[in-house]
Amino acid sequence: MDSSAGKSKSGFVENRSIDFIPENERHGSIFAQFTLWFGANLQITAIVTGALAVVLGGDVFWSIIGLFIGQCFGAAVMALHAAQGPKLGLPQMISSRVQFGVYGACIPIILVCLMYIGFTATGEVLAGKAIAHLAQVSNTTGILIYACFIIIFAAIGYRLIHWVGKVASVIGLIAFVIILTQILALSNISELLAVRHFSWSSFLLAVSLSASWQISFGPYVADYSRYLPTKTSSTRVFWAVGLGSLIGSQISMMLGVFIAQVSNGGFVGNEVQYVVGMNPIALVITFLYFSIAFGKVTLSTLNAYGSFMCIATIWNSFKPSAQISKLTRLTIVLAMVIISTFIAVVGEHTFLSAFKSFILFLLTFFIPWSAINLVDYYFISKGLCCTNLSVKA
């Protein structure tokens, strides 16, 4: 357990870990929830996810429709998880002890850790390429530089993560306008949308890609709403998180669909270079490389922070009296980033095929977990608050 009870909420570096957040330390706003998830989804991996719908056989029109349907379903699910945060005041996965028990919850938590590592590794591949071009270094060096930023941001914690989310929202919007403008200059969008060859397999793949993208946030979305005051409206949290994630990811995935269609195969294997190379202006190219790297930092930091929460929860299951210090946080984050960095370096050249398999695997696991958690919370426990749920369960 963390021994930081009673510490001031004013510090920028987070003191707490998996313990309950008391009312006098609650802070934050509904708008910050929107900007965090909006910014976290305006990034290159979401663009690649959208592009997969076309790369794997879909057309522009039905891919966009399928992606949007999946977004709506998935965002609703993840937003229902987010609404638990202010009421429980605990990280998302520790609440799984209600459904699975103290030791049983370790099984889904371990799988969530694998998800964090996988998503961080894919982010490092793409952001590492962007940093490599900015700094004129090798891709491997770019990945290592990016990994250092993840470690620093995740070690500092909650407040910095929300600040990064706000900045990423602004940078991501500017990058979106630039890329969309270039797409409009290179092709006729109405002509792209007019080519339609519907097939159930391609359509359902698009739905699955976006739904699994959104649902994969479920295991840690409440980690970033748990500091909100207990009386915060669950409905407002639901809409802020859900709309932020839905709008941000749909923008990115729609861009991915258009880019994959106009690239004539040039996007595959050259995702970062192709997106940036669509614009001929050197200053704009530099900004786009920066926006790709910074946009990925938000989500990768969420993953590293979430991995700390999960591993601390497992540790607490077997050693309830153990102290979780800032050094422990740093050590856990460092270990997770080292593993993901190794995977990123080794798997850099097989990125797209591995990413497709990875994101669809998430769907097969997280839908059952999410269904169990939500049914229990909203229909059986009926919004169980933390006064009835100790960290020791």
Residue ranges and their predicted role:
Residues 1-60, 202-208, 226-236:
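Membrane-interface "cap" regions at the ends of multi-pass membrane proteins
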Residues 43-46, 69-77, 112-121, 171-182, ...:
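Selective recognition of specific alpha-helical transmembrane segments in multi-pass small-molecule
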Residues 45-57, 83-85, 121-130, 152-160, ...:
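Transmembrane helix-loop junctions in multi-pass membrane proteins
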Residues 66-100, 107-115, 298:
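Juxtamembrane transmembrane-helix boundary signature
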Residues 105-136, 293-314:
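Hydrophobic transmembrane alpha-helices that form the core helical bundles
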Residues 128, 141-183, 197-198, 239-242, ...:
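Membrane-interface loop-to-helix entry segments
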Residues 314-349, 393:
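Loop-to-transmembrane helix boundary motifs in multi-pass membrane proteins
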Residues 369-393:
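C-terminal membrane-solvent junction of multi-pass transporters and transport-like membrane proteins
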